[in-house]
Amino acid sequence: MPQTLHVHSRVKDYDILFTDHVLKTLADCLGERKQRKLLFITDQTVYHLYQTLFEEFAQQYNAFVHVCPPGGQTKSLERVSAIYDQLIAENFSKKDMIVTIGGGVVGDLGGFVAATYSRGIPYIQIPTTLLSQVDSSIGGKVGVHFKSLTNMIGSIYPPEAIIISTTFLETLPQREFSCGISEMLKIGFIHDRPLFQQLRDFQKETDKQGLERLIYQSISNKKQIVEQDEFENGLRMSLNFGHTLGHAIESLCHHDFYHHGEAIAIGMVVDAKLAVSKGLLPKEDLDSLLQVFERYQLPTTLERADVSATSLFDVFKTDKKNSEQHIIFILPTETGFTTLAINKDDHQFVEKLDSLL
């Protein structure tokens, strides 16, 4: 599906390149930088699945590889430090480049390293999971976890380019595919109900071209939102639908039990229930959300982990989206979204939350 989307950024513009030929597209992106040093950051899963691809990289470029353990706990300052050590040992300068090839964890981690090493070096993202292709690679957000706090340290640092190839999705486990669908449903439910309906009816096994169209549509939606509100002062906040609770679940579960898209699905259900209770969203819309989550085997309750409403509320207080005295939730409405500000001392809300979990 060779196409290109151009993203306008206040930091720097970049292209999202859709391709079936990753090596050629990467070579085109690098241009004169082909002669510079490249550090490929990936994880063990991707490295073993695509070892031939990495061997071709090594033949064509002055390339080094940093292979991370898989999983969310890799997004740590300890891993950042290990990558810094490798960059310094190989004498990387601001003229050299990082290429991330992996899911959202690798993209966020590698982007953060690029943003901070030598006060910023260029990088290219090659996302290999559905979630990273439609969500985490788009918009320039990079960062790592701090202790148990999700994405607490980070920046907005756009890449030189993002290379999207659905070929990578052929090796993606169903659970990870559903996590990507979760983020696509999020943007569809808030901003593009026709997209939501198409995802509800989509048949993965028989419609590869349909998947490519849905990916392109999801990315186009996020591109438009990011271009209007890159630094999350208004419209881009809508993309945090499900994320206040979702990030708290990830933090308390130490990024085990629930993958990101699963935690966000639970968060979306609770946000939608809150919206229904306040008369902002028809119950039929909540029912539709629950049905499509069930279809994609996404969780809608916290049955896998012993997590209390009180412990979740305590984590909410550290959320980076908060204002000084309030915890911020994004609630879906019949026509879009609104924000709900909960006082950090509102212990009655804990009881309300407990009834919704």
UniProtKB/Swiss-Prot annotation:
Superkingdom, natural source: Bacteria
Location in the cell: Cytoplasm
Binding site for Zn(2+): E183, H243, H260
Reaction catalysed by this enzyme: 7-phospho-2-dehydro-3-deoxy-D-arabino-heptonate = 3-dehydroquinate + phosphate
GO function terms (MF aspect): 3-dehydroquinate synthase activity; metal ion binding; nucleotide binding
Enzyme Commission number(s) of this protein: 4.2.3.4
Role according to the record: Catalyzes the conversion of 3-deoxy-D-arabino-heptulosonate 7-phosphate (DAHP) to dehydroquinate (DHQ).
Protein name: 3-dehydroquinate synthase
